[in-house]
Structures are given as structure tokens and as C-alpha cells.
């Protein structure tokens, strides 16, 4: 790896990723050609066909009234990158896709903690997808591009950050796998980190992980592949480090030739030392007592009272510095919470470090929902609701990713009342989309195939109460609701949120010892005050999803392995509680549609649909069933009851698998046409017969056919004759005769599977 000046002022550096028998991937960074007015701009290439432009810009003046770092990350998917015109009404890109939003979060999570604390200038990173090979995913390339452009921008940034996707394929961790290679993977991880240490003794500090088991993991395990256990996941994190180091080195080399010098940016520390000392003097003792209150509401109320008292007592000496007092009070709270965990192995709600809060699980909590459940863990309360529908109701995805439809959709809602607050209610924010995606990925590996369960599934998680990891609560509630809806999951899935606290603790002999304490089932405060939080979902046998964020410059591998093992113990406990509520799929709700799958010959699809959809629309109108036909001849028939579905199937089979009617068969037909000499009656789709006018009067002469029957009338008829040309002659059958007659022989249906 080295930097090259390919033209005057245009530099590039390259990182080569060697995957052995799985091939080599090349990541190239170029600067000096595009977007030259941005503070930093980089074009990143993956094997020359996938091309992203990342720009970083900074405001000239700080937002000194902000008490947070104003970083914005945007990902712009341009449909021309895949040679497509947008499918929207105006034929241009609109709101960002879910893939783009999730990529923004992947970029933000490792970049944000890499900026110096106290920075208040607005920073905006925009990544534009210019070209995309359909065999590639662009998200991890975007992490590297965003880091590289920020590294060049002259900002107080402690990068670079490297990002890599590694997938476990045939026992090997493969970096930057293609979409085709991912189909053979059992586990897929996006890992971001940065180099730490000296040149001779450098390591990679993992900053962020987003991981999941693949859709077909269970089939691969059954075929002999190793299951993605906690041990395997830890090995994958280690396997990602050399790739991250190579990507960081390439960015460093580019910055060495093209980066702007770091500018002068005013920093706004949260508080000065004199404020913290004053707050600690008056608040340490009462705050320590308040932090021992187990209940969240009572603890928060008492803490707020102490904060108001501290503000009042210090106002005279620190007039105009109320924000600093508030920040110092928060810092003191963090210190006390962490000290109690590290020294006493006890937490603010009185639990030990491995204890789980009280668990509760129940199903069928909403009367008319197809499936519903309520899962509670302490003060976190999640309601899961499942809705089943026809496959044609699957979500159509118009993005640059390989996925074009989503049969399983998970939507997560986090209303403000879940934390006892007021706020905006409406379209989901990025956080809600991210939490929903995590819970969705956790369940996908255990969902039945479309052949096993021909339904589109919408899962909604309502966060009704929040005090720690509503996303993992959503995983548990989703499993319960799906089973209640009758979905035959391959295994139940549960999730748990874990935390890690570390610090140097002074021992009795005056020496210091570095301690790491892993916390099971973290509270909201522990999430905010800890050094790492990670969420693990899975079955009793393997991990299905994992999300990790850390502020530490490196976690000892044995510490991480122990924390993952601790998470599995907690997950097993939760699965046992869930099994007491429901341990197998329930009978489907009477309000859920019944969907039957049949096959028709591909060359008969056009006949079933009819010109301009006339035939399929008539079947739908007559039977009340919903019908969806796939290109391979699979037909999904859905109806509120089995009789309607069977009527539609009979009509479809009569067209696609026709059986010639026989003399003596009786049908309830529909009059489709009247003439001077009789009435034509539809027996089956495409099969009509004639009732002569002389047969309509029951032995009496009639002047007009319309005096007896009209178009649209239903009439019971019997086949009297079929001539050598296939013309069918019918005679009316009286109600008495029809009641005594055996049921008519209908066309035999194709093999059907009913759910």
C-alpha cells in the first residue's frame, strides 16, 4: 500500500484485501478530482465498478448554544448508479430508503466518538452512491469513504476509521463478500474500528459491530456448517481486525499527502473543574442515596429534586453557568453509578451484575389481531402485533440493494409516553428505523419459507414502557406474537442487552487494577454511563443478531468472550419464561385469511388471467377470494373461509387443468347470453352450454327466453347431450331433482397446500 499522485493534485491510495480462494478485493481512495470546494472529499472504489463520493463540510462558526455535537450524516442513493430511473411519480429520488438510513447509522456510530469532545461546529458528511455493481453492497465502503473525507478536512478528528463486512463462508471469514457469496454464509458482520498503539505494537480497537445470521443459516447448519455461536462471533471480530488495519493504513497514507492542517476550532467543555468540585461537595452524599432507589420513577424524581437543590445552592457563586452545573451533576451521577458497579458489584436498582429484572410474557392480548403478545422486563414493556396477508402485500423495495421485495416487515414504534414524556408523534425517526431493522434481522433466520407458509407478515412492536433495551424486548414480543398467529417458527428467539463498565481501581496497597464488569439486562442509565453496550439475540443454540458500540480503545478478547457467554445464559433464562407463555404455534386466528397454494402450467397463466385481467377479476368477484399469480405458475388463493378459496381453486383448475364434462353431470351455472332460440349458460370458465327455448317452459310454450331467465341468473342444469363438435346441450333441473341428485363431478383440483 502506498499513495500515488496520478495527476497534479490528484492522489490515490489502495488497500488490497486477500480472501485466499475466495478472491481479492481492491478498495481505492482518490482525492483532488471531485467536489473540491468541500473541506474534504474522497471518491472510494470497490474493484473499480462500485464508486462512492464522500464529502465532509464544517460550519465556520460554532453553535455555542448547543449542548451536543451537531454531526449530520446523509447517504444519497442515485438510481443512475444501477442504470435505473426512480419508480416514484416524479421519477426522481425522494426520501432516503431504509438501506440509506441504516447506512447513515453505520457511519455515524464510529465517526461521532472520533471527534474531539466539546466541538460545536456543525459537521456534515454526505455520501453519494455514483455507481454500484449489483454483486456488491455499498454500506461498508461508505464507512471508509466518510472516514477518509473527514480525515482530509482539517478537523479535530482522531480517525481514520475502517469498516469491513466479514462473512463466515465454508469455515472462512471472507471480507467484502459479494451478494452471491453471502448466500452461502452462515453469519455476516459489519465491523468498524481504528488503529491504536505505536507503530511497532499496534492493534485495532473495535468501535461498532452490526451482525446477523443469514436467511438460510438453519439449512446450512443442517448441511454440516458450523453454527454461529458466541465463540464463533468472537473469532469473527478478531478476523476483521487485519482488514480494518489495512483500510486505516490506506486512509492514513492518503491523508499524509492530501490532508489539510487541523484548523483552530473553539471547544466548549461541558463544565469547568471549579463547577464540578462545587457540585461534588454538595451533591455526592444525597445523590449516592438517591441512586440506591430501585424504582426508576422514584429514583428519577429524587434525583431531579437534588439537582434543583444543587442549582439553587450554587446559583449565587456560579451565576449564568447553570448549564455547566447540570453537566457536572450528570458527570457526578455517572461516576457514582460506575464506582458502585466496579467496587461493590451492585447496580443502581439493587441487582447484581448478572441479574435479570422481573420477566412477564403473555399472548393473545388484542382480540381481533391475527397474533399479539405482551412482553415485560422490569419497566420495559413491549406489545407485539402480527398481521398476515397475501404474498402480494409484501413490501416493494425501490433502492439500490439486491432486495426488491420484503415478505417479512418489522416496524418499531417508540412514542414519547413510553418514557413519561411529551413529544412529536408521527413518521419514524432514524432510531426507530434502526431498532426495527435490528429486531427484524433477529427473526428472519427462523421464519418459515414461502412454500411452508405462503403469507406476507407484518410485525409491529409498540414500546409502551422504556427503561433499557426496547429493541431486544421487541425481539421477544415478536417471537411470542408470531407463534400466537400460527407462524411455524423454526426456533424461538430472545434478546438481551448487555453493558460493560471498566476503570482503574485503586487497591488497598496503593496500586491500581484495571477492572472490567459485564452487566446483564442494562437499564437506560447504565446504557448512557457505560463503556460499551451490546445487544445479542438468538435461539438456544446460536446467535441470530448482534449490535455493539464501545467507547473503549480495545477490549481484551477474554473479557468479550465472557460477556458473550453471560449474554447466552440470560437469553436461555428468557426463552424459558417465553416458553411458559407459548411453546408452539397456535391455531390461526379466525380473522386471519386462509391462503392455499396451487400450481398451474406456465403456458396457462395467460388464460387464467384473461384479456386485461377479465377472467381473474371475474373469479375474484364471484368467489370473494384474493388471487395472486407468480411467474413460475404458483397461484396463491386467499379468502376469509375455506369454501370461498375452494370455489376459486375449482374455477382456476377448470381453466388450467380442464376436464371435459360428461353427460348427466349437473351444474349451478350462470346465464351469460340469451337469444331467440335459447339461453347460453356458463358451466365452468370457458365452458358454456345451450338450454333450448323449448326446454325452458317446463312443457309449456314460451314466447321469449327473457320471460323465464335473464343474463346473470343462476340456473341448475344437467348435460343432456354433447355432439361430436363438443357442443353441449342442457336441460333445466328442478329444485327437487337437484336436491336428490348427487353432487356434480367438478374438475379435479391440482395438489394444494392450505395454511
Curated annotation (Swiss-Prot):
Q: Which cysteines are joined by disulfide bonds?
A: none
Indicate what this protein is called per its UniProt record: Polyribonucleotide nucleotidyltransferase
Give the residues the record marks as binding Mg(2+): 527, 533
Provide the cofactor list for this protein: Mg(2+)
Q: Which reaction does it catalyse?
A: RNA(n+1) + phosphate = RNA(n) + a ribonucleoside 5'-diphosphate
| Annotated gene | pnp
- Specify the KH domain's residue ranges: 593-652
The alphabetized list of GO BP terms reads: mRNA catabolic process; RNA processing
